[in-house]
């Protein structure tokens, strides 16, 4: 089926006399449907798709209800949806199943190609969930009568079109920026700020409330493009048809303008200038370990995607800890170094997956696996450690942090560096997610080929690093500077043990890992060419839901609702209750609530680990098939 202006119909359609002329949009829609159907056949990917879709659907229904009850709150939530459409693809790597580079040989103009790609982008879970969310505009229009409802339906459709086109433009602009080092740093900083704002939104809300700016915020959310549909529905309800029609026309014009801009950006992806080759200074290092470390440092400095993610981690740490300055609180500022290390571990958690099939070099070279893994850890420590130390020391001096806080900072930094080095190595081997090989990436540098599994791996890495850092903080709370010693010991122990686990897995299942990175899936049992070993742990959708759900709930109950309130209560009368349940109940019930939360969290953790270990035990000893061409 050709993707040209007048495609040739299949032979059986021509004989039947049917109109076999199928346009490019219809073909790409079918391709997207086929890709989605194929993804749902994979148990692992299907679980993440349905899990994310279910959570998104709940949020979308909440947005519809909020728009119907409180339009001000609904406008703020619609703004959050637009922010999510802008930031989400940047974090996940563009999320382009069909890329413009794939259709260069079809002869389609950039306008027709852009229209076909945009049309096909409505196929998926995220657009459907977003379509439910923008029904909040219709919920507001229903109160104004039949005509207002009809106009609200048009406004909701235009609002959805704006979400799709603005998201594409954001990915396209950042994709252009990350082709240059300065642009990659700028794009990473903007993404870090965009993600830090929701994380520390309480500071922004408190600052606005202190200045009595809630009404100004309500006006601003309606003035933003995300609120134009809601403003049109409200105007139609009160009979201001000129304003209502004008808002809808503005939405349509914005959708058309962003679509045109995206088509212009597509031109740069389908045509490319020749690259200039400049001689590079030769590496000089003593021994294979030093040479490998320097090679990884150089490749990281030249990889624009890695530069972008490193800048994101640094910007997130700075903005996350600096936003409380809006309410005059400097207490979080010195923690920017530790937060930066945690975020850097997140973006470092899929090293082998991002390098792709280059793993075969380590598999066929005797002794190279150990050297390469240790060099990757050394690269992480050299790239993050000195910068985190300078950042922490500088912000301690700038904020005038009291000396009583220094043991906590030292403990957190030491433990986070060691745990980050160990966890990133283990996750890169045990939970590798295949992506597009670097030499096969297209014009969109962000489109690395990852999916929701890579996002889940990054968040699991963050939870593990934070969890392994907490014991050192507890020791610092109880014994002062001994917490720093505990942090060094904890970090070193975690790094040593997790490195051993990763090396053992590489030795035993390195071929299976290469198969995963090459073919996008692990080998299935019973196929020809099986080799002795352990079958990869495969969980059913129900088991995945239990393991993941128990792990997430256990994390929420054990740390935010258990350990953190206990530390606050131990320090005296809490002044900030935030969302800690134990701080909102009467004083007599505070410690019992903490005990219940810690018990429930630990129990859920045990359930999650037990279910996973049971599946791992069942997989142990089963033959692992490897394709003959692996």
Would you name each region that the model predicts?
Residues 2-100, 109-358, 369-630:
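Hydrophobic alpha-helical transmembrane segments of membrane proteins
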Residues 103-105:
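Helix-capping/transition residues at the boundaries of transmembrane alpha-helices
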Residues 360-366:
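Catalytic phosphate/nucleotide-handling subdomain of diverse soluble enzymes
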């Amino acid at each position: 089926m050709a993707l040209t202006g007048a495609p040739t119909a299949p032979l059986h359609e021509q004989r039947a006399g049917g109109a076999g002329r199928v346009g490019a949009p219809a073909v790409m829609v079918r391709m997207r449907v086929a890709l989605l159907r194929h993804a749902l056949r994979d148990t692992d990917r299907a679980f993440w798709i349905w899990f994310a879709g279910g959570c998104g659907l709940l949020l979308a229904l909440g947005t519809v209800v909020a728009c119907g009850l409180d339009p001000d709150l609904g406008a703020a939530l619609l703004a959050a949806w637009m922010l999510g459409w802008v930031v989400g693809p940047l974090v996940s790597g563009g999320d382009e199943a069909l890329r413009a580079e794939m259709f260069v040989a079809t002869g389609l103009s950039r306008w027709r190609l852009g229209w076909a790609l945009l049309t096909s982008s409505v196929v998926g879970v995220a657009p459907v969930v977003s379509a439910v969310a923008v029904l909040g505009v219709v919920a507001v229009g229903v109160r104004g009568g039949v005509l207002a409802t009809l106009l609200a339906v048009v406004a909701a459709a235009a609002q959805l079109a704006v979400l799709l086109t603005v998201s594409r433009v954001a990915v396209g602009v950042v994709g252009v920026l990350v082709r240059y080092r300065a642009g990659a740093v700028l794009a990473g900083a903007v993404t870090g700020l965009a993600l830090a704002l929701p994380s520390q939104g309480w500071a922004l809300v408190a600052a606005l409330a202190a200045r009595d700016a809630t009404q100004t915020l309500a006006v601003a959310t309606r003035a933003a493009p995300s609120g134009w549909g809601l403003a049109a529905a409200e105007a139609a309800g009160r009979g201001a048809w000129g304003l209502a029609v004008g808002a809808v026309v503005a939405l349509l014009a914005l959708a058309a303008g962003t679509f045109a801009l995206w088509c212009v950006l597509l031109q740069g992806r389908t045509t490319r200038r020749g690259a200039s080759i400049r001689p590079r200074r030769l590496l000089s290092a003593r021994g294979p370990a030093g040479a490998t470390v320097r090679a990884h440092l150089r490749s990281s400095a030249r990889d624009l995607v890695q530069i972008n993610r490193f800048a994101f981690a640094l910007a997130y740490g700075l903005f996350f800890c600096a936003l409380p300055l809006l309410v005059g609180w400097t207490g979080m500022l010195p923690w920017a170094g530790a937060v930066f290390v945690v975020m850097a571990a997140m973006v470092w958690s899929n090293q082998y997956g991002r390098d792709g099939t280059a793993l075969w070099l380590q598999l066929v070279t005797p002794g190279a696996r150990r050297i390469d893994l240790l060099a990757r850890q050394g690269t992480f420590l050299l790239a993050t450690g000195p910068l985190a130390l300078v950042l922490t020391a500088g912000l301690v001096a700038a904020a005038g942090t009291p000396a009583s806080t220094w043991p906590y900072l030292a403990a957190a930094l030491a433990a986070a560096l060691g745990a980050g080095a160990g966890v990133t190595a283990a996750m890169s081997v045990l939970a590798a997610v295949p992506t597009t090989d670097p030499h096969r990436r297209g014009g969109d540098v962000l489109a690395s080929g990852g999916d929701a599994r890579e996002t889940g791996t990054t968040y699991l890495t963050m939870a593990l690093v934070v969890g392994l850092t907490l014991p050192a903080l507890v020791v610092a709370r109880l014994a002062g500077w001994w917490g720093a010693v505990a942090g060094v010991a904890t970090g070193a122990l975690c790094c040593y043990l997790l490195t051993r686990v990763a090396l053992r897995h590489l030795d035993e299942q390195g071929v299976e890992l290469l198969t995963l990175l090459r073919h996008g899936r692990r080998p299935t049992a019973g196929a020809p060419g099986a080799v002795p070993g352990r079958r990869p742990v495969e969980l059913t959708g129900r088991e995945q839901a239990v393991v993941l759900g128990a792990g997430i709930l256990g994390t929420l109950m054990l740390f935010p609702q258990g350990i953190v309130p206990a530390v606050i209560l131990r320090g005296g009368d809490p002044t900030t209750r935030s969302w800690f349940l134990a701080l909102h109940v009467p004083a007599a019930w505070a410690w019992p609530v903490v005990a219940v939360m810690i018990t429930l969290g630990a129990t859920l953790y045990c359930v999650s680990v037990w279910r996973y270990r049971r599946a791992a035990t069942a997989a142990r000893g089963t033959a692992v098939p490897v394709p003959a061409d692996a």
